[in-house]
Amino acid sequence: MEWRDEGIILGTRKHGETSAILEVMTRAHGRHLGLVRGGRSRKQQPVLQPGNRVDLLWRARLDEHLGTFQAEAIEMNAARLMDSAVAVYGLQTMAAHLRLLPERDAHGGLYEALSVMIVHLDDADAAGELVARFELLILDELGFGLDLSQCAATGTRQDLAYVSPKSGRAVSREAGAPWRDKMLALPAFLQRGSGLRADPAAVEDAFRLTGFFFTRHVYEPRAIEQPDARAGFLAALRKHHATRKAIAGDNAA
């Protein structure tokens, strides 16, 4: 068995004295693992870092075997990403979400989204919005996608302000007003075609929204905890926003 594909490295772990098990998200073969012989060498280690985009050759005697990878660098993103706590935790969060999907199942849309994320993840002002959108994509791929296109009660596409925790569908401000204390906030930037950027409060609302449905549909049924990286990502974002606010205050003074 043999195939060639490109992939983004999610992680590695040691195997024996000199080799490594490589975990990648590939364009056509989904999340895939393989053995890299000599993967702990000085030559290979810089290539096999999370966030790097690589050209992969996978070989195995049988399809169900772990197989071996040969990996060559296409884009060396790791050094840039490692300079940002937001980027490090963001990548770890997305990797944890991808592990919720069956190994070797192709998800081309997720690969394309991840490719975009890698380019912008070290921009802390954009990272929160990007990872929140990625979480919505993961929920959709898992079969628990939210319908944010129109009001569940009236069908209107205007002034959508809430999401029903029961149905996962958007609700307009007027229709949801009597139950607003029980509704989840729908940040405007998540609405298709809004063209709006996310402020810190909207980012918090977005992760509260996706976190609710991850807990209900994924974490609780599987008896697993939210990934630590997600909490680390949100903490890094809050620190970044607090620092920016403090700097802006000093400049204004």
UniProtKB/Swiss-Prot annotation:
InterPro entries: ARFGAP/RecO (IPR037278), DNA_rep/recomb_RecO_N (IPR022572), NA-bd_OB-fold (IPR012340), RecO (IPR003717), RecO_C (IPR042242). It holds the Pfam family RecO_N. One of its GO terms (cellular component) is bacterial nucleoid. One of its GO terms (biological process) is DNA recombination. Keywords: DNA damage, DNA recombination, DNA repair. It comes from the Bacteria. The keyword DNA repair applies. Involved in DNA repair and RecF pathway recombination. NCBIfam families: reco. HAMAP family: RecO. Belongs to the RecO family. This is DNA repair protein RecO. It comes from Mesorhizobium japonicum (strain LMG 29417 / CECT 9101 / MAFF 303099). The lineage of its organism: Bacteria, Pseudomonadati, Pseudomonadota, Alphaproteobacteria, Hyphomicrobiales. The gene is recO.
